[in-house]
Amino acid sequence: MLHISKWERHSNSSRDALGAAALNFCKNAKSKDGVHGAKFYWPNPNLIAIIIEAETGSWGIAAEPDGSTMKSFFDLGDAASCIMDETWVDASLGQKRSDKAS
């Protein structure tokens, strides 16, 4: 699964603070079992996009966060507002779930 989010910098937050929070968030995600990758990108100077690739249930709403994960979320939230948050399911998992309805 891909967990994709976009974060817009608060006007009272520096770009350095946003970049540091995003980096720490990605480092935290990569430290979790089942997370294969976590990167952030700058689409423009006031916006970051975070892409986390993880096995189902190891990141996102289905995973119970620990203290360090919650701190990384809160630190990111102090620097920016989440303006988009999506989970993309790969084709094979999507097909397996669709087949259950048949």
Residues of each region from the PLM?
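Short glycine-/aliphatic-rich beta-strand segments at the starts of folded cytosolic domains
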Residues: 1-11
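Solvent-exposed, non-transmembrane alpha-helical starts
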Residues: 15-19, 60-63
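Short amphipathic alpha-helix segments
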Residues: 16-31
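An amphipathic, aromatic/His-enriched active-site/gating alpha helix that lines ligand/cofactor pockets
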Residues: 27-37, 52-88
